[in-house]
Amino acid sequence: PGANHQYFKSFESFFPNEDIEFYYYDQLGSTLSDNPQIDDLWTIEHYVEEVEQVRKALGLTKDNFILLGHSWGGILGIEYALKYQDNLKSLIVSNMVPSVPDYNDYANNVLALQLDPEILKEIRSYEAIKDYTNETYLGLIHEHYYPEHVMRIPANEWPEDVVNSFAEINFPIYLKMQGPSEFGIVGDASLKNWDVTERLNEIKVPFLSIGAEYDTMDPVQMEWMANEVQNGSYLHCPNGSHMAMWDDQQNYFKGLI
């Protein structure tokens, strides 16, 4: 939540070569869109209606409207399909699972335990007192967690588009919806209890779930999701993480296109 379109710029190296027409847009509150200071707007329901407004403005229909959402955008894509799938040709959910509680469990009981025990102990000490903005805490996350599970590229080699996109995140929106921790969604974050596992079978449009071996999300659950919808398939990126469109481009775009 709160991120802009810039980290999708990797698509420009692949889609035009296949004559695929595609559109980015910045959600309300992020870089190129207005940023009204109205907390009540930052809800799934609002953003679903925003997608529908964009679709109408572009004149897209069920004959040509393929929606791709990554991470939080995957949540949004699923919710859009549950309300407006008659307007969709197909849905692509990239690097997102259908349950935030399950994501929290995976982050804390699988990925966190892969860290060096002393590093994890120090990270947990800051989380215990909710000191999520501490420079040492952030440094530990960026040094030990991000390079394994967010983007498997050395930090000093991160693409400029990704660096700029992360730098321009609207943090009030991010904190309201996602929360301050990188190990799941915690506190009063509005997405904390989001779970549509029981509704996946309502989705009838062609559905592609994209997951990655080293993702912050459980690739097993992302594959499971593809089997729960009526017409789903799964694309696995064996070398990728949460930003597989950057760190496993060969598999990501070969499977997507």
Where are these regions (language model features)?
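Conserved HGGG/HGGXW glycine-rich cap/lid loop of the alpha/beta-hydrolase fold
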Residues: 1-40, 54-55
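Conserved acidic catalytic loop of the alpha/beta-hydrolase fold
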Residues: 45-64
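Conserved hydrolase catalytic core segment
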Residues: 61-107
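Flexible "cap/lid" loop of the alpha/beta hydrolase fold
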Residues: 91-133
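Alpha/beta-hydrolase
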Residues: 121-198, 205
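Short beta-strand/loop motif that positions the catalytic acidic residue
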Residues: 203, 209-211
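Conserved alpha/beta-hydrolase "acid-adjacent" motif
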Residues: 216-221
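Catalytic histidine-centered segment of alpha/beta-hydrolase-like enzymes
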Residues: 237-253
